[in-house]
Amino acid sequence: MGFFEKIAEGIRKTRDSMMGKVNSLLNSFTKIDEDFFEELEETLIMCDIGVQTSVDICTELRKAVKEKGIKDPAEIKDELKRIIAEMLGEDRKIDYSTKPTVILVIGVNGAGKTTTIGKLAARLTSEGKKVIVAAADTFRAAAIDQLQVWVDRAGAEIVKHSEGSDPASVVFDAISAAKARGADVVICDTAGRLHNKKNLMDELKKITRICRQQAEGCSLETLLVLDATTGQNAVNQAKLFSETADITGIVLTKLDGTAKGGIIITIHRELGIPVKLVGVGEKIDDLMDFSAHDY
């Protein structure tokens, strides 16, 4: 299965479910009236598109219907696709233009940080890049060992300290090692943290500061890993993390496991943070660049 087929298949469940619900709605109406728009708004919300974003979509759709004189609900679908595509904007990919590029990976436990790091490292090494992974989740038992397994599978290198050591020191050493060894990319793991754990959020600020200092002049990406199956809770996480970190992109995992997925639109619309990568399966090569066109 080729790259585009794989990502299309991975998000098929999400796309087909959303459009299936919309198609059912379109087929059940013979005219476009206020009842139609109310039903459409409810349908979008059920697909995990936030309330405000759903309202905005319907507002834009009302304008298009009026301006273009659309009478038949069946003609709405193309306009709906256009509005959503405009909300998602241009695809934004990770910037690998500098050497090293530093990627800080953050998020709560269980969202898929470790597997995302392993898959990303594997993808980059397969492209001929030299990758160093910083094992800066020093708080959780076995986190370093778990990451080591993924790094070995990916054919990358790891910089690690003992459990309980200072995470910022691990990041500092990893970036220093990358410079010394001529590595292309440094991927930094971090402890899974919740918004109400102030000490962990403070630690994240410290790590971010170290990254900026050590990687001055280099591309620095901060990727927030979110579990697509958690719906609106993922949006809340993104809002809270963005208060602490300068998030440059979202990694949306487990997208193959949800029939909703409107979360992508909501995050982009409400927070202005692009989804850069999506996890669409369990295999090591099931991490893809997000494509609004395929979505």
PLM features: residue spans?
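Primarily NTPase-proximal linker/entry elements flanking Walker-type ATP/GTP-binding cores
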Residues: 13, 17-136, 143-188
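Short hydrophobic/aromatic residue motifs in ordered secondary structure
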Residues: 51-53, 140, 256, 284
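Conserved catalytic-core segment of NTP-binding enzymes
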Residues: 166-181, 195-293
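Short glycine-rich anion-binding loops that position phosphate/pyrophosphate groups of nucleotides
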Residues: 191-193
